[in-house]
Amino acid sequence: NQELQAFDETLREFLTEPDHFLTSLALVNHLQRTPVLAAQDLYAVEVEGKKVVPVFTSEQDLQSFKATQESAREQTWVERSSLDVLTQLVQAELFGLAFNLKEDGDVSNTTLFASSELIQFINYFTQTLNNLLGEENQKADSKDKIYLVPAFVHKREEDGQDDRLFATMSNAEGQSYVPVFTNLTSFAKWYGNETFGLPFRKAKGTILQWPLSEIYQPSTGENELDKVQG
């Protein structure tokens, strides 16, 4: 199953670099679209004192799990939507989803997601996609569009307001500009670039979702725009 394999690879990438913006988007896309291997009926096991529902992005990991868990062998394992399983476990007041549970071996795709945190994560990145790629934003004037804006955000101790510095780029004349993006393709090129995106990611930069007016006149906090041309 190529889709499940792609889901597995994305999960591994996310667990290696959980702050990676594009990997997070890809993971949410898989959670919404790619079925996982899960028990047909609600089935939970205890891990670290918490009741979790095991799901798998690897057939091999499922077989290994069944080999070590007698109760798992009694279940009928099928392809199911992660979101359906998540809804079910929330209703049953269980802790969360456990991906690719195993006792030893390659654990680079093994993790527990608390349901509350996972729902928040899915909602945030779904909203990001809707803000950026929704029909309303596509049709909006450039001054009204929502852009992806790379920035460094520091909270001031005295009043809790945000100070924001932007990941500026310079032209041959030495003039600085704030990079903003309306589509994921151009953003991905910048984000993956060794000169721009890599240092930004290492410095734990934040991706804001803003119209241009927020850059020049923010509704909260302060933006550092000295010597920036545009």
Language-model segments: which ranges?
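An interfacial alpha-helical scaffold signature
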Residues: 1-230
